[in-house]
Design a protein with these regions (language model features):
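Short loop-to-alpha-helix "cap/lid" segments that border enzyme active sites
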Residues: 1-147
């Protein structure tokens, strides 16, 4: 994939995002110009287990309790570009911190109107949803110019 990204000069237009941070570390070793997005999940879901916890193999190395708690700081220190966070784990304060660090913030999987509106209010940069048309309709009906 790196070969194609380089060949078509897409380094600053493509974000490679992963739940397994070890992949992102390897990408950094191979090419510093590839934008990297760090997926975080601090609570287990029905089909997906959390990846942010002490000694998590998904994080690829050991982090202090502060680093596990202050994820925007941790991702900045890892020279990441995007924090892709489960929407129930994000706060407005963390979005503001991430933006101060120059990180874009995307949230996933946001499907309910109250949650969509809250994420827009928080100032996230992107919403991953199963219902993109629903977000368009909500924004249009409420005169929200978000995207």
């Amino acid at each position: 994939i790196l070969k194609d990204i380089k060949e078509y000069n897409l380094e600053n237009r493509v974000v490679i995002t992963s739940y397994d941070w070890r992949i992102l570390y390897e990408l950094k070793k191979q090419n510093l110009n590839v934008l990297r997005g760090f997926i975080t999940l601090q609570q287990s879901l029905t089909k997906t287990k959390k990846n942010i916890y002490e000694d998590s193999p998904w994080m690829g190395k050991k982090f202090s309790p502060d680093e596990l708690f202050l994820l925007p700081d941790t991702i900045k220190n890892l020279e990441g570009h995007v924090w892709s966070v489960f929407y129930k784990d994000v706060t407005k304060q963390n979005v503001e911190i991430a933006h101060k660090h120059g990180l874009a913030v995307t949230v996933w999987t946001v499907n309910r109107e109250p949650d969509i509106l809250r994420m827009i209010e928080y100032g996230v940069d992107g919403i991953i949803t199963d219902y993109p048309k629903k977000i368009q309709e909500i924004c249009k009906s409420k005169n929200i110019s978000w995207f």
